[in-house]
């Protein structure tokens, strides 16, 4: 199994694996039952992501086959007293020429937007609007894009600012096999995503990036690398173009970083099957608060 994710309500679990399928389970209390197996990919499925429920019951998947598939659960009108729901593939995006390693939905305030990171060096952004899908695709990292994460829709400090700006921002960070992180901003006039910042520091592939959902006074991005470090990049609202980083060192190659919903705790996992939790102390240093062994 390569990825697993609960839907917004925690009632559905989707998993994906090397057998080219996606499985949907219903969670009821302590039990779960398989309700659907989705087939459509021609290679290992690396990543799945649930859209926000305001857009419907929608799941995106990406695979080694270079495709991004969008699946939707729809209610079937039948004479049966039991509700019948069926999953259908509603969009097949196959413009990438190599593995699509990660898909990530934008914050729902920005619209129904899906960003996709591919080994072909390109990022695509799919948008569902007025009952149809449109896409943009652009070159991002020379040696391939491994990961992608959206910034929160509200900019840092907008909650505490006396005169907040337009608030809605469309930006995301990518991590590449060129050891770099890149931050991309949407320009509403040109309707394109432009590179606004390159963050250097890792000495090997950046495997995962995660933008913290916190929108207090700082922005935080965590990155996990094959160089056995996690870097936590911070930018203050008073100087948004300036990013400082702190390095956390490990004994193993690192695969994933993930923030808690409030954005104050970071989970790190790597090649040793351990998960560690980290928190910023009052001096601004990141400290390990817990080790979880499988």
Swiss-Prot record:
Q: How does it assemble?
A: The COPII coat is composed of at least 5 proteins: the sec23/24 complex, the sec13/31 complex, and the protein sar1. Component of the nuclear pore complex (NPC). NPC constitutes the exclusive means of nucleocytoplasmic transport. NPCs allow the passive diffusion of ions and small molecules and the active, nuclear transport receptor-mediated bidirectional transport of macromolecules such as proteins, RNAs, ribonucleoparticles (RNPs), and ribosomal subunits across the nuclear envelope. Due to its 8-fold rotational symmetry, all subunits are present with 8 copies or multiples thereof.
Q: What is this protein called?
A: Protein transport protein sec13
Q: Name one GO molecular function term.
A: structural molecule activity
Q: Where in the cell is it found?
A: Cytoplasmic vesicle, COPII-coated vesicle membrane; Endoplasmic reticulum membrane; Nucleus, Nuclear pore complex
Q: Which Pfam families match?
A: WD40
One CC-aspect GO term: COPII vesicle coat
Q: Name one GO biological process term.
A: protein import into nucleus
The free-text function statement in the UniProt record for this protein reads: Component of the coat protein complex II (COPII) which promotes the formation of transport vesicles from the endoplasmic reticulum (ER). The coat has two main functions, the physical deformation of the endoplasmic reticulum membrane into vesicles and the selection of cargo molecules. It also functions as a component of the nuclear pore complex (NPC). NPC components, collectively referred to as nucleoporins (NUPs), can play the role of both NPC structural components and of docking or interaction partners for transiently associated nuclear transport factors.
Q: Which windows of the sequence hold WD repeats? A: 1-35, 40-81, 95-136, 140-194, 201-243, 249-288
- Please give the SMART domains that the UniProt record associates with this protein: WD40
Membrane topology (UniProt):
Peripheral membrane protein
The opening ranks of the lineage are: Eukaryota, Fungi, Dikarya, Ascomycota, Pezizomycotina
State the organism named in the record: Aspergillus oryzae (strain ATCC 42149 / RIB 40) (Yellow koji mold)
Tell me the PANTHER family matching this sequence. NUCLEAR PORE COMPLEX PROTEIN SEC13 / SEH1 FAMILY MEMBER, PROTEIN SEC13 HOMOLOG
What family name appears in the similarity comment?
Belongs to the WD repeat SEC13 family.
Domain of life of the organism in this record?
Eukaryota
UniProt gene name:
sec13
Instruction: Tell me which stretches of the chain form a coiled coil.
Output: none
């Amino acid at each position: 199994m390569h990825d697993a994710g609960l839907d917004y309500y925690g009632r559905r679990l989707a998993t994906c694996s090397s057998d080219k399928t996606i499985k949907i389970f219903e969670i009821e209390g302590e039990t779960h039952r398989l309700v659907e197996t989705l087939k459509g990919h021609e290679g290992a499925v690396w990543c799945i992501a649930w859209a926000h429920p305001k857009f419907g019951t929608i799941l995106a998947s990406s695979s080694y086959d270079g495709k991004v598939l969008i699946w939707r659960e729809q209610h079937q009108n039948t004479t049966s007293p039991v509700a019948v729901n069926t999953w259908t593939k509603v969009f097949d995006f196959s413009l990438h020429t190599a593995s699509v390693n990660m898909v990530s939905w934008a914050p729902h305030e920005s619209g129904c937007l899906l960003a996709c990171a591919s080994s072909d060096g390109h990022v695509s952004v799919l948008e569902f609007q007025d009952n149809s899908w449109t896409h943009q695709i652009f070159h991002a990292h020379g040696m391939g894009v491994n990961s992608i994460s959206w910034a929160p829709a509200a900019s840092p400090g907008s909650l505490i600012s006396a005169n907040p700006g337009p608030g809605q921002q469309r930006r995301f960070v990518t991590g590449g096999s060129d050891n770099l992180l890149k931050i991309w901003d949407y320009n509403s006039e040109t309707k394109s995503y432009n590179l606004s910042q390159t963050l250097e520091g890792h000495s090997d592939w950046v495997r995962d990036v995660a933008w913290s959902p916190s929108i207090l006074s700082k922005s935080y991005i965590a990155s996990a690398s094959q160089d056995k470090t996690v870097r936590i990049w911070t930018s203050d609202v008073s100087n948004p173009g300036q990013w400082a980083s702190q390095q956390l060192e490990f004994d193993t190659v690192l695969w994933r970083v993930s923030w808690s919903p409030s954005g104050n705790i970071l989970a790190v996992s790597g090649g040793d099957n351990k998960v560690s939790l980290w928190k910023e102390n009052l001096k601004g240093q990141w400290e390990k608060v817990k080790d979880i062994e499988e």
